[in-house]
Regions:
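Redox cofactor-anchoring modules in respiratory/redox and cofactor-processing assemblies
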Residues: 1-177
Length: 177
């Protein structure tokens, strides 16, 4: 597709959201890029400036689409596990930080999260970002920071109720930008 194609057109060309579900979130440039609310992406063109304005980047160009059945905590746990397992271990912020991020997100996903975990995750991710030899540390930190920023209510629900908001009948349909 051409640069500048509306995301809504790209989604249509790809067959839409599976099973006619509601679009919840999109990672427009591969798993290392910040996540964007679905309603924002539906109004966004697939070009560098528009994606930057939405709060993300085109990155690798891989587009990850998540529907309203996606648990954002579980999605972040999977991404964090990848970065933890793939870190080369050469520099301390990435080696130690990716493991710490993964373990805390996993704990939240398992219903063992604690008050303050979200602020701690953001703080640790901010200390990895820009402090590693290569860009891998940034790639590990950006999803954590953006998932918490964009879907904090869902993460907080996991901590407060020890279970997922998705499928509980309490999912917040409001889409914060």
């Amino acid at each position: 597709i051409s640069l500048g194609t509306p995301f809504s057109k790209l989604l249509e060309m790809a067959g839409g959201v599976r099973d006619g579900r509601r679009l919840k979130a999109v990672i427009p440039g591969g798993c290392s890029m910040p996540v964007v609310h679905g309603n924002v992406m539906l109004e966004t063109n697939m070009d560098y400036d528009a994606i930057a304005k939405s709060g993300s980047m085109l990155g690798s160009g891989a587009v990850i689409v998540m529907d309203d059945t996606t648990c954002m905590v579980k999605a972040l746990e999977r991404l964090s596990r990848f970065y933890f397992s793939e870190s080369c271990g050469q520099c301390t912020p990435c080696r130690e930080g990716t493991g710490w991020l993964y373990r805390v997100v996993k704990r939240i996903e398992e219903g063992k999260g604690e008050q303050g975990d979200l602020d701690k995750l953001d703080d640790v991710a901010s200390k990895i970002e820009g402090r590693t030899i290569c860009a891998f540390g940034d790639a590990a930190a950006w999803p954590v920071r953006s998932f918490i920023k964009q879907f904090r209510d869902e993460f907080q629900y996991h901590i407060d109720h020890k279970r997922c908001m998705v499928g509980s009948g309490h999912a917040d349909d409001s889409e914060a930008a």
